[in-house]
């Protein structure tokens, strides 16, 4: 019978506590290496700037930042939009998302943006660009902060989460983004909330090259 070298090592280790400890350390390292090779590094052990992969289940998907695909997920939904986009935002500086919104508008999609009033004028804000492109842009100043980060698309898709529509949220912040499809009762609740804030918001219009606000 052929001898098994690994079995010999195990038998030797069983006769020596010191060898047993070394063997356990080696096996532990091997097992950890195999797990990481197959499954990737566990999220708890990832460095702070690393991205965590998203997941999807039952018409629902989730993505995480930094650099975990949140902006890409938003843009993909906007490119698929056919009739309407209702958007609420606090800070809005993402070049990719404003481009996708303008592209949707040019396809004939009705795009309505309700942005926090103070944040609309922050450095890098895309609110004026949205207004200049012809989108229906409003500003909500009825609250300390209008902090909703939501998109409602075509009466069936909800995008929500902590993720601001900004470059910083994509590349630097720890955020989450949830995309839900065909959740009709949830959609109706989000749509009612959107309409409530739209009702007390001011229009944000462009006049003679300068963005001005005016009442509804």
Task: Please place each PLM-identified region on the residue numbering.
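Short, small/polar-rich loop/turn modules that mediate ligand/substrate recognition or access, typified
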Residues: 2-64, 68, 72, 109, ...
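Primarily the HKD phosphodiesterase
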Residues: 74-136
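Short Gly/Pro-enriched turn/cap motifs at secondary-structure boundaries
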Residues: 138-142
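Extracellular/periplasmic catalytic domains that process cell-envelope and extracellular macromolecules
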Residues: 79, 106, 130-131, 143-146, ...
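Solvent-exposed loop/turn segments at secondary-structure junctions
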Residues: 91-95, 117-121, 143-146, 157-158, ...
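Second-shell loop/turn segments in exported
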Residues: 60-65, 86-89, 112-118, 175-180
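Signature of lipid phosphatidyltransferase scaffolds
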Residues: 158-216
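Short, structured motif recognition centered on aromatic/hydrophobic residues
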Residues: 90, 150, 190, 194
């Amino acid at each position: 019978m052929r001898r098994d070298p690994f079995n010999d090592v195990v038998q030797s280790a069983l006769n020596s506590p010191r060898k047993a400890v070394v063997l356990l350390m080696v096996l532990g390292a091997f097992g950890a290496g195999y797990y990481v090779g197959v499954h990737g590094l566990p999220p708890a052990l990832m460095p702070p700037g690393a991205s965590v992969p998203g997941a999807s289940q039952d018409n629902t998907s989730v993505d995480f930042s930094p650099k975990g695909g949140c902006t890409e997920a938003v843009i993909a939904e906007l490119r698929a939009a056919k009739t309407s986009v209702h958007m609420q935002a606090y800070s809005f500086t993402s070049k990719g998302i404003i481009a996708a919104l303008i592209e949707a508008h040019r396809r004939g999609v009705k795009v309505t943006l309700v942005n926090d009033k103070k944040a609309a004028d922050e450095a890098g804000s895309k609110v004026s660009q949205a207004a200049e492109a012809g989108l229906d842009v409003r500003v909500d100043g009825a609250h300390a902060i209008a902090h909703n980060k939501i998109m409602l698309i075509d009466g069936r898709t909800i995008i929500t989460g902590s993720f601001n529509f900004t470059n910083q949220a994509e590349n630097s912040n720890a955020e989450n983004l949830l995309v839900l499809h065909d959740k009709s009762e949830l959609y109706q609740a989000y749509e009612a909330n959107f309409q409530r804030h739209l009702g007390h918001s001011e229009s944000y219009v462009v006049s003679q090259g300068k963005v001005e606000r005016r009442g509804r």
